[in-house]
Amino acid sequence: MTTTIIYTGQLRCSATHNQSGTVIETDAPTDNRGKGERFSPTDLLCVSLGTCIITTMGIRAIDMGINLDGTTLQVQKHMLGDPRRVGGIDITLGFPASLQLEEKDRLILQRIGDNCPVQKSIHPDIKTNIVYNWGAVTA
């Protein structure tokens, strides 16, 4: 993966995914002199963990003949200071009530999520709390 990042001023950046041309913009958070109108770089760290968890689970789910469509994730970032950094990430996954899985299949998928590449790349000082709520999402 190659990306091109341009600092556009006023604590904002524009990042282009070179293969697809997709662009995302970042902004500093309001508590650090930004406008808070876009994801902050530390927000993207947390979003990356959440999307990696569900993407890797989705890959295995396809192989297992399981459809995870409609699964939701709530991500909460906890910042620490001195030095300013992410101290914790809470992620709660809500799976559709219509998804009826055996316990062994749930455990397989949870193990995949708990060991996704982003999770394995995060420094151990960052505390992650991942909760899997099976059957939590209703139509």
Descriptions of predicted regions:
Residues M1-V47, T55-A139:
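Extended beta-strand/beta-hairpin segments
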